[in-house]
């Protein structure tokens, strides 16, 4: 049985060093009860106390202070696991930890240190019931907090450059300082996933790196799907210790230069609405509000140093910035959405001819893909082509997803499809409301994004918009959602 599969018989949470002795004694007593000799149990007690001490010394964001100690045993080994949700350990720190030296001296038979993404830092300390020492270890920590008085100088000295795959552990630590373990994209806590995204081109990132190699800022753009032509910009992370010194602007400027050089049609973004900073930065470089994703961000997502109201799930502002030349297109939209569609196209300065007649699909089958984000509580459905079976297909998808109780389901419809207007009406009958428009998202053109929100509360009172255009769009999106929601509650599927 692997150590991860062993069921704990004892679990303690330590929040202060004064409890070290009690935790160590509990481990020692449990070890002796399992047949480990008292002198070996005492050594195990010592290394566990040291591990807890090291965890408590690591930097923690609010609400993540506790260190969990669990004990499990099977027929061959006695396992103590120490877990914390503090600053992620990086591979060079563990080699310098005092606990590692104790392990090498035989205080444990097996010793493994690891950062396991959103599960946090995990140390497995094992005593074999038939001792067979083969110490094994893998990770590390080296970091000193920046003096607040020197933050401006540090920002000035930061090297703004393209991110390399080897920077992945540093990005994870920077992300932790901003969000703890609450960031909704779990892949950004996974060094291998980050490296894959960079290597395959699904993500292109810019980082701010201090002279000592520490990453203190990140911004980039990523493609939802490999064949997309307009990436999502964002994933903005700036070390809270260095905010207020225009590091975001420097990062974004380099990111935008790279997008221009690579011939990207445009970039879209999801900006938080618990504060207006991200929206203002996007608008300052030519982005335009094109929608709002209501209740798309769980309350568990918290930003260090920013307001984090917990009155319900938070909303995200959709923005789009044209980068290259965008040619004219004809879009199929229902009559009641033509006005908002025309307004947004005019604001972006791109030509869109609107066709509002309802055209029945010609193809028999709908091309649809789905992506589930369990950590975020969201589902994304994307229709590549509208078929005659859309009504049935959409109903089947919703029934299949019902057991997951998703917080929100987003549905993308291809506006270049002559039957898109008909598809919108079908989607509305299934509880989807207008959320926004993303031009040139795919090689086939623009998509309409619709939203179907679960039964969780939405925080409508704390949606902060950077300007009046955003406020007007917010009000429109809320009104559309209320219209569809009333219809759904009445059971109206006409």
What is each of the regions a protein language model found here?
Residues 16-30, 150-189, 207-209, 232, ...:
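Short amphipathic alpha-helix that is part of the acyltransferase structural core
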Residues 38-63:
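Conserved ATP-binding N-box helix of the HATPase_c
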Residues 57-67, 195-207, 211-217, 232, ...:
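A short helix-loop-beta-strand connector motif used in the catalytic cores of GNAT acetyltransferases and
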Residues 76-101:
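Glycine-rich/acidic phosphate-handling loop/turn and adjacent ATP-lid/helix
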Residues 100, 238, 244-259, 266-269, ...:
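Conserved acetyl-CoA-binding loop-helix of GNAT-fold acetyltransferases
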Residues 120-121, 259-273, 404-414:
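Conserved GNAT acetyl-CoA-binding A-motif
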Residues 165-168, 172-240, 368-377, 384-389, ...:
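A conserved beta-strand-loop-helix scaffold within acyl/acetyltransferase catalytic domains
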Residues 270, 286-308, 433-445:
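Conserved catalytic-core motifs of GNAT/GCN5-like acyltransferases
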């Amino acid at each position: 049985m692997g150590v991860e599969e062993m069921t704990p018989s004892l679990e303690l949470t330590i929040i202060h060093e004064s409890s070290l002795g009690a935790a160590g004694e509990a481990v020692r007593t449990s070890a002796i009860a399992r047949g480990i000799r008292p002198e070996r149990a005492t050594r195990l007690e010592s290394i566990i106390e040291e591990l807890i001490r090291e965890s408590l010394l690591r930097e923690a964001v609010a609400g993540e202070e506790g260190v969990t100690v669990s004990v499990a045993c099977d027929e061959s080994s006695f396992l103590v696991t120490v877990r914390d949700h503090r600053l992620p350990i990086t591979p060079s720190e563990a080699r310098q930890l005092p606990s590692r030296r104790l392990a090498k001296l035989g205080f444990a038979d097996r010793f493994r240190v690891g950062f396991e993404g959103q599960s946090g830092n995990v140390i497995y300390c094992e005593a074999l019931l038939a001792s067979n020492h083969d110490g094994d270890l893998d990770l590390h920590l080296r970091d000193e907090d920046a003096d607040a008085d020197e933050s401006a100088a540090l920002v000035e000295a930061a090297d703004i450059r393209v991110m390399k795959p080897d920077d992945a552990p540093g990005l994870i630590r920077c992300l932790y300082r901003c969000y703890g373990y609450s960031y909704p994209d779990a892949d950004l806590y996974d060094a291998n996933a980050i490296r894959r995204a960079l290597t395959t081109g699904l993500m292109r990132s810019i980082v701010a790196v201090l002279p000592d190699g520490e990453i203190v800022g990140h911004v980039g753009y990523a493609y939802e799907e490999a064949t997309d032509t307009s990436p999502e910009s964002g994933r903005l992370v700036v070390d809270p210790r260095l905010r207020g010194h225009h590091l975001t602007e420097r990062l974004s400027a380099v990111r935008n230069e790279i997008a221009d050089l690579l011939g990207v049609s445009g970039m879209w973004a999801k900006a938080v609405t618990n504060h207006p900073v991200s929206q203002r930065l996007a608008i300052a470089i030519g982005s335009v509000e094109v929608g709002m994703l209501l209740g798309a961000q769980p309350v568990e997502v918290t930003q260090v140093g920013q307001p984090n109201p917990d009155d319900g799930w938070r909303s995200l502002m959709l923005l789009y910035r044209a980068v290259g030349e965008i040619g004219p297109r004809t879009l199929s939209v229902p009559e009641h959405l033509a006005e908002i569609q025309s307004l947004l196209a005019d604001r972006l300065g791109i030509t869109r001819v609107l066709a509002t007649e309802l055209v029945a699909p010609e193809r028999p089958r709908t091309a649809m893909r789905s992506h589930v984000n369990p950590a975020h509580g969201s589902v994304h459905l994307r229709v590549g082509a509208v078929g005659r079976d859309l009504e049935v297909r959409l109903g089947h998808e919703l029934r299949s997803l019902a057991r997951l109780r998703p917080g929100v389901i987003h549905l993308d419809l291809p506006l270049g499809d002559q039957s898109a207007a008909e598809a919108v009406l079908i989607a509305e009958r299934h509880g989807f409301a207008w959320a926004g428009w993303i031009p040139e998202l795919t090689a086939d053109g623009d998509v309409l994004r619709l939203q179907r929100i679960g039964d969780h509360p939405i925080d409508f009172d704390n949606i902060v918009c950077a300007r009046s255009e955003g406020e007007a769009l917010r009000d429109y999106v809320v009104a559309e959602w209320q219209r569809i929601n009333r219809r759904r509650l009445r059971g109206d599927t006409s």
